[in-house]
From Swiss-Prot:
It holds the Pfam family HIGH_NTase1. It is found in: Cytoplasm. It comes from Staphylococcus epidermidis (strain ATCC 12228 / FDA PCI 1200). Keywords: ATP-binding, Cytoplasm, Ligase, Nucleotide-binding, RNA-binding, tRNA processing, tRNA-binding. GO terms for cellular component: cytoplasm. InterPro entries: Rossmann-like_a/b/a_fold, tRNA(Met)_cyd_acetate_ligase. Belongs to the TmcAL family. GO terms for molecular function: ATP binding; ligase activity, forming carbon-nitrogen bonds; tRNA binding. ATP binds at residues 7-20, 100, 153, 178. Catalyzes the formation of N(4)-acetylcytidine (ac(4)C) at the wobble position of elongator tRNA(Met), using acetate and ATP as substrates. First activates an acetate ion to form acetyladenylate (Ac-AMP) and then transfers the acetyl group to tRNA to form ac(4)C34. It is an enzyme of class 6 (ligase). The keyword Cytoplasm applies. This is tRNA(Met) cytidine acetate ligase.
Amino acid sequence: MKSVGLITEYNPFHNGHLFHATLSKQRSETNVTIAIMSGNFVMRGEPAIYHKFKRTEMALSAVDLVVELPLIGSLSSSDTFAEIAIKTAQYLDIDIISFGSESASLKDLQYLATQMIDYEKHPDFKEKLKQGKSYPRILSELTHNDTLLQSPNNILGISYLKAMQQFAPHMSALTIKREGSLHHQKVIDHHHFASGTSIRRSLMNDNVDWKNVVPNQIQSLYCKPHTTVEDTFPFIKHQLITQPKESLHSIYTINEGFENRLQTMIHRSDSFESLLSNLKTKRYTQTYIQRVLMNVLLNITKDDVNKEINAVRVLGMSEKGRSYLKYLKANYPNRHYITNVNQKTAHYFKNEIKATHVYNLLSNQSQTDFNTPLVRI
C-alpha cells in the first residue's frame, strides 16, 4: 500500500487542512493518507484548543490514520519538530511527505535545505547562534534568500526536507501551495480559508464566523475551546517559585542562564501574557519562551528527551487506515503500533500521558490515554 503523510497540528481542523489533504491524495496518487498530529500541546508553545481525541475525530473526515507526534517534537524548534516527525513517518513506512508552503517550488526549497545542512557546519553559523540571533535570521544572512525564509511554512518545509535528507533519503516530498489567509492573520475575512489563529479567536469569542471556514460535515464537533494558554499561568508560577534553580536548568529547551530570568520575572508577573512580555528580549523570541514555559509546566527535562521512535501511538483510523495498520504489523512484526495504552505499553508514552493529565487539569476534561478508546469511523 502506498501512503502519503501529513505532519499536522489541526488546532483546529479547517478548510485549509481539508484542501491540503485532498490535493495531497490526488497529487501523490497514494492509497492511504496518514496524519502525524501533535497531541495536547502544540508547537507554538500552548495547549491545543481541543483535546487530541476530538481533533482526531475532526481529522478523520479527511485522512485514514491519525497517530500522535511525540511530545518532544511538539515542544521543540522547527528542526527537532521535523526530525521527530520524519522519523515517525519512517516508522510508519510512509512513502511521500506532503506539506503546505507559501512557495510552489519544491526545487527551491530542496536547494535551500541542502545549503542549510552545509551552512550549519560552518563556524559562522555557531558564532551567530551564540550572539543570540534567531535561526531564520541567521539562515537568511548566510543564504542571502530573505523571500523564502520570511514565510513560516517555508521554514518548516525546509526543516522537513533537511530531516528527510539526513534520516529518510528514500522518502519523497510534495508541497502544496497555501491558499487564503496568512499564517497568523487574526480576523476571519469571510473567504473560504482562514488562519488557525483567527479561527481560535472566533471560537473563543463566541463569534460564528468560524462556520464559514471549517468543513460543514464536522461543525457539530466544534465548541468553546477546552482551555487557553492563560489557564497555564498558576501552574507555571507554582513550578517557577517552588523548583530550585538547578532543577529549572535541567528543563528541556532552556538555554544557559534563562532559568535566572524566569525566576526573576515570575515575581513581576500576574498573568501568562505579562510573564511573556517581561521575559521577551531580542535574543528570546515569543515562540521560544512559550515552548520553554510549556516544558516547565510539564516538567519535561533534558533527560526525558529521546529523538528515536520506539513505538507509535495510534489515535484513530478509518477502515482504510485499519487495513494499512494490518499491513504494517504484518511487514514489521518487531515494531510497536499501539492502539490501546495500558500498563504494558505505557512506558513508551510517559511524556504524552503526563501531558494529557496536565491538559485535563487545565481543561476539566476526563479523557485519558488509558480510558479513551481508539477513534474509529
